[in-house]
Amino acid sequence: MKRIFLAIAVLCYAGAVYGQDGGRIHRSEFVPFDTREDADALNRKNTDKYLVFAPGLLNDGEEVLGIGDVVNLPNGWFDSFIYLHLENTGTAYTLRVNDRTVAVVEDPFAPADFDLTPYVKQGDNIILLELHESNTPELQKGFTPTPVKPFTNSYLFAQEKRSIRDFNVALIPDSTRKFGVLDLEVIVQNGYNYEEPITVGFDIYAPNGKLLDFSVNDITVPGRSLDTVRFSPYIYHTYENSWGAKGAAPLYRVMLYTKRKGVFKEYIPLKVGFGKTEMKDGKITRFDKPVTIVSERYNAAADAAATCKELLALKKKGINTIWPNAPQPYWFYNLCDELGLFVIDQANINAPEKRDDRTAGGTPSNDPRLADEYLERVRNMYYHSRN
């Protein structure tokens, strides 16, 4: 919500694309919860259709097939979308499920998401990663991430065929600069072949926990397609809780949910700070006032506790903006939100030794051979953490 996106490329992606054929997808990183209590506590352990993915060496007799796991998916997971989230692979890889290629991923450091729905079956499923060297090493020569346990924060989960696909959320000043407006778009998906009704709602709570507004909307979505539900309620007294003002970082809580025949089906918790970061006359502004950016290169430590300690030390030095080299774990952005730190998000494009080479093919930005992978990395960065 407070990200300042590094202008590595200018891309206009209008919402998530419905991917009926599965494979790699691009959207905000989130896991739906079965109950409001677990959503508030970010407790994934009680979510029925959620599994930690911790692969190891996969063998067929004496032959090592690669890194992977045999995952048993019960009948209750089906009639759903089934997703895989991978992080900390450490190298490029080809993802195969039940002997079918799902995707080839060249970026060894950024999180990636996949729709496995067309590839999996009830019972045992072989999820295999064939690891290999990246074909585009030029894009990450200048960056080595902090070592962490391989596949940390990798998981599978399922969502109903009528569910939330993605969202865009911001809490911004209104045109009079007196109040706030919750600018919320909820992208819903219908995986059936025929139109289906979906009930979508939200609640928003002040930093002190007070319920400020809520709404529930019914929408009918055509078969195998997406639609967007938009909410824009006025939120009063927001200027009393401005994010970033004098170093304060109060956050509003937003809860998204869906219902089916009166029964709650999923909860997705969000946090958002009040304010809007803009470019005016070549200057970064917030609340129509210039912001002095004091930045430092920094990438997440091995865990959230160590990262929080290091971020606090940077803030004590007067740093107000963090500039990582590649997309970070979801909890990194949450920490920066809570600590009142801006983030200049960057795709995993790091080639400092070529920064002054203006010839064709010199820098990654000017190399036609790298164009497809370059744009893929920017796209992944944008969707992963744009909220």
Where are each of the predicted segments found?
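Alpha-helix capping and helix-loop boundary segments enriched in small/acidic/polar residues
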Residues: A302, W323, S365-D372
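Short, acidic/turn-prone active-site loops that include or flank metal/cofactor-
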Residues: D107, A347-P352
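Generic structural signal for helix capping and beta-alpha/helix-loop junctions
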Residues: W331, P352-K354
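N-terminal/domain-start segments enriched in small and hydrophobic, helix-friendly residues
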Residues: D345, I349, G362-S365
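Short beta-alpha connecting loops at secondary-structure transitions
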Residues: L139, K354-R369
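N-terminal signal peptide c-region/cleavage motif recognized by signal peptidases
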Residues: Y13-A14
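An active-site-proximal structural segment forming one wall of the substrate-binding cleft
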Residues: D367-N387
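Secreted/periplasmic carbohydrate-active enzymes, especially glycoside hydrolases
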Residues: M1-A7, V17-Y330, N334-V343, R377
